Amino acid sequence: MSSLGSPSPFFLAGKEKAFQVERSLRINKPDNPQLYRTGSNNANTFTVSFWMKLGRLYTSYRVLFASYSDGLTLNNDHRLRFNDEGDGSFYSTAKFRDPTAWYHIVMAVNTSGTTVYVNNVTHITSSSKFNLSSVSGAIRHFWQAGDPAEFAFDGYGAEVALIDGQALTPSSFAETDPLTGQWIPKDLSELTFGSNGHYLKFTDSTNLGKDFSGNNNNFTVANFSVAAGAGNDSLEDTPTNNFCILNPLDKMGTVTLSEGNLKVVINGDNASLVTGSFGVSSGKWYYEAVADTVGEGFVGWIRKDVSSYTGYPYQQNGSLIFYRGGSLYKDGAGGQSYGSSYVNGDIIGCAINLDDNEVTFYKNNSSQGTVSITAGTYNPNTTTGGGSATYTFNFGQRAFSYTPPTGFKALCSANLPDPTILLPNKHFDTLLW
């Protein structure tokens, strides 16, 4: 079970049989994940391509790709940094800090130097060459430093390719959709990878490091899980079907996010909250939250016209509805008797029907009752009454624990309605006369 609905053509590249990325690999920094291989190739000419989605916004730099002492990283200020041991570091001007979006990274190296692209835009050019063979049999890592986990990347990765012997442009790996203007992935199966090239798709649960280039240049993986449940790191959140996450840019108070921005720990005596990245104003939608530590936590939906808070979030008027074991908090009226209490380990289903303006909460697949709400645009949300709580969310990027109610969909881009205007820039271009 994936998107629980027919994908929107808008997110299928606007053309027939558009290529779909099946899986991503979640990189949860605290787990010390590792993805690497030892091998040789043409150190003077090669191309690396991959897609990434940010997780926690760390203040230390994060490794994207490294071999020996040369590396491509996200700096502590969110700029890209290409580091050459002999010639120093080179930085992008732009900063990459949107945890809700997928970025396409391409690094092309030839005898003239190194070029780094993001979403088909050049961001770093250097006469220095990224050296894959600084030492014999150099180890190359994706998203992990060679030694400690301190500088590991945190987030998601997909479609990892290395082309041995060619310096390619981003158009070899992705293209501009003619209807939407989006930069979207291509099918890489027809590329010539070179004898030491590789293509990682993360679709084989028995071998996450499997090379699909035909070269059998498999990667070693460590500290990733494919077990069913919240710890599964093989997910359906991809560049062709972006899923809702808890947004680290839309929070207040003491909130710590991890596991691809799907797990939240809320601490402290002050009111805290974090909001999901998808807002919906029509249709029927469903997500689940595992109550890891119930504490003082609430889960539910928040209407996005709430721009400020004066006191605890669940006390606001006309815009929020939360379920806390045995109680319902709605529109500023707290502590209404609702449903049964829940304990650590229970799974809370949160269904919102914006066609009829209703919300239903479930405890371990048992309906706790349907409640009316006001119309508006709602986002998933969790908050606290001043204490602590821990929840793990699932917006559909892995299989739900329980089948959603009939007609309810996961919060992902494939399920969103088609936009009214395609290629909006064509309607807002500046005209001179």
Model-derived features: positions:
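Glycine-aromatic-enriched beta-strand/loop faces of beta-sandwich-type recognition domains
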Residues: 298-347
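Extended recognition patches within non-cytosolic domains
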Residues: 2-23, 30, 123-127, 156-241, ...
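Short hydrophobic/aromatic patches on beta-strands that form ligand-binding or substrate-lining surfaces
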Residues: 48-56, 105-107, 157-162, 200-201, ...
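Low-complexity, glycine/proline/serine-rich flexible segments
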Residues: 1-44, 77-79, 85-86, 226-244, ...
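Extracellular glycan-recognition modules
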Residues: 29-81, 113, 166-171, 280-281, ...
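Short surface loop/edge beta-strand patches of beta-sandwich-type extracellular domains
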Residues: 29-46, 89-97, 146-149, 184-191, ...
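Extracellular glycan-interaction patches encoded by glycine-rich segments
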Residues: 85-87, 136-157
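Extracellular glycan-interaction surfaces
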Residues: 3-29, 49-58, 71-132, 329-332, ...
